[in-house]
């Protein structure tokens, strides 16, 4: 027979409080949580959202969060060129924000993602993308925003902010969020793994996050936080005129 037990330093009283305080002063939050509080969620050195996501998990905000047909779904994108594209699906319900779904794929064109949007049968509100969606491509002379418009996908542009400001906005937003455990599983794992590397020379974490497989989901999440905070007059609505009254993805 096997017995599994968890003994957290904050609960057992076996370690002197002064010793724990000293350990906190010498460790990062994640290191302390792993070493003294038996946290398996805080095991990524330099994790950017580790603390906030652990609090969301322990607070019961990573659970079953189904689609509510009474509220529109907003989408938040990081569009890659020859790389991954990531999409978060959210619903604002009062002061809470439900993160109900996540999708990521790579080496696919915009028609593929339009098909994915259709397949989910959500009632959509706004579709939001970063400023570089307006950059014109050399081959076609069109921006990806114009290409999306031709496909019936109507994007708004999220204001451009420094990465660190966007990260701070995301950290401040997470306490308001409820995540669907299953549909957001991949995206949540990316957020947990999103981190800064350690500089042995300066004995500190570098300012810029590591760019790896977790970055696309984290970038889309950052645009989500910035866009939600800045939504209103500062969000640039589409200026193009519709060719038809019917727009299945109208913002």
Predicted feature locations:
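Signature of the SF2 helicase/ATPase Hel1-core->accessory helical subdomain module
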Residues: 1-11
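Hydrophobic/aromatic beta-strand patches that form the interior of the parallel beta-sheet core
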Residues: 3-5, 75, 128
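ATPase catalytic-site recognition across NTP-hydrolyzing enzymes
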Residues: 12-79
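Short amphipathic alpha-helical "interface-anchor" segments enriched in bulky aromatics
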Residues: 25, 33-36, 191-195, 221
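Short beta-strand scaffold segments in enzyme catalytic cores
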Residues: 85-90, 222
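Mg2+-dependent endonuclease catalytic cores in nucleic-acid-processing enzymes, primarily RNase H-like
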Residues: 88-212, 229-251
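Histidine-centered active-site/metal-ligand motif
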Residues: 216
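Short, hydrophobic/amphipathic alpha-helical patches that form generic packing surfaces
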Residues: 219-227
């Amino acid at each position: 027979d096997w017995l599994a037990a968890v003994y957290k330093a904050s609960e057992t009283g076996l370690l002197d409080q002064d010793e724990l305080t000293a350990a906190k002063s010498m460790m990062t939050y994640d290191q302390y949580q792993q070493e003294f509080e038996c946290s398996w969620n805080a095991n990524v050195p330099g994790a950017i959202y580790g603390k906030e996501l652990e609090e969301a998990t322990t607070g019961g905000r990573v659970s079953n969060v189904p689609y509510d047909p009474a509220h529109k779904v907003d989408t938040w994108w990081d569009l890659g060129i020859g790389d991954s594209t990531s999409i978060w699906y959210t619903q604002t319900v009062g002061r809470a924000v439900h993160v109900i779904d996540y999708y990521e794929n790579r080496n696919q064109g915009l028609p593929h993602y339009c098909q994915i949007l259709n397949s989910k049968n959500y009632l959509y509100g706004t579709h939001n993308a970063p400023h570089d969606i307006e950059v014109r491509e050399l081959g076609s002379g069109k921006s990806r925003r114009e290409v999306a418009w031709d496909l019936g996908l109507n994007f708004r542009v999220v204001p451009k902010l420094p990465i660190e400001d966007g990260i701070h906005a995301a950290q401040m937003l997470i306490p308001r969020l409820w995540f669907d455990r299953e549909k957001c599983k991949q995206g949540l794992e990316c957020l947990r793994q999103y981190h800064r590397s350690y500089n042995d020379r300066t004995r500190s974490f570098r300012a810029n996050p590591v760019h790896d497989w977790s970055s696309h989901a984290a970038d889309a999440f950052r645009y989500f936080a910035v866009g939600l905070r800045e939504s209103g007059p500062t969000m640039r609505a589409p200026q193009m005129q519709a060719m038809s009254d019917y727009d299945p993805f109208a913002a």
